[in-house]
């Protein structure tokens, strides 16, 4: 424990919080261009082909971001909106692509949790 005199000479060091999504540069979302769209496999014990895209952001960073939902229309040179949020079973994937924004289409025939997947509200009689 330091003495009062030691604290007067040199104050306590502030604990700095490290950002979980540094490429966004404190913005809620960033626009970017897909440089590669591909699938990758998750860590053990999970097994799947997860859809991801390498995106060059307007902040200058190139990040790997996850494409959520069933099916997508993304290809190279698509303009996308990227938000923070990691994927636990994909190492190095710390960002998500926002569905229904810019070139990314919403998930078709989605009826629950629609706002998360950019799906419009279905017509009254069509959903049954």
Swiss-Prot record:
Top-level lineage group: Bacteria
Listed PROSITE patterns: RIBOSOMAL_S12 (PS00055)
Gene Ontology terms, MF aspect: rRNA binding; structural constituent of ribosome; tRNA binding
Keyword Ribonucleoprotein: yes
Positions bearing 3-methylthioaspartic acid: 89
Transferase among keywords: no
GO biological process: translation
Alphabetized UniProt keyword annotations: Methylation, Ribonucleoprotein, Ribosomal protein, RNA-binding, rRNA-binding, tRNA-binding
GO cellular component: small ribosomal subunit
Function: With S4 and S5 plays an important role in translational accuracy. Interacts with and stabilizes bases of the 16S rRNA that are involved in tRNA selection in the A site and with the mRNA backbone. Located at the interface of the 30S and 50S subunits, it traverses the body of the 30S subunit contacting proteins on the other side and probably holding the rRNA structure together. The combined cluster of proteins S8, S12 and S17 appears to hold together the shoulder and platform of the 30S subunit.
Family: Belongs to the universal ribosomal protein uS12 family.
NCBIfam families found in the cross-reference section: rpsL_bact
Quaternary structure, from the entry: Part of the 30S ribosomal subunit. Contacts proteins S8 and S17. May interact with IF1 in the 30S initiation complex.
Protein name: Small ribosomal subunit protein uS12
Gene responsible for this protein: rpsL
């Amino acid at each position: 424990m330091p003495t009062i005199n030691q604290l007067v000479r040199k104050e306590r060091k502030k604990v700095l919080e490290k950002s979980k999504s540094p490429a966004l540069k404190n913005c809620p979302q960033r626009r970017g261009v897909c440089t590669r769209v591909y699938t990758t496999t998750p860590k053990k014990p999970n097994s799947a082909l997860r859809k991801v895209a390498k995106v060059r952001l307007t902040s200058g960073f190139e990040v790997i971001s996850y494409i959520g939902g069933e099916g997508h229309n993304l290809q190279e040179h698509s303009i996308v909106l990227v938000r923070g949020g990691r994927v636990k079973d994909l190492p190095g994937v710390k960002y998500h692509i926002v569905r229904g924004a810019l070139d990314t289409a919403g998930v078709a025939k989605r009826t629950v949790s629609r706002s998360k997947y950019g799906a419009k509200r279905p017509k009254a009689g069509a959903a049954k």
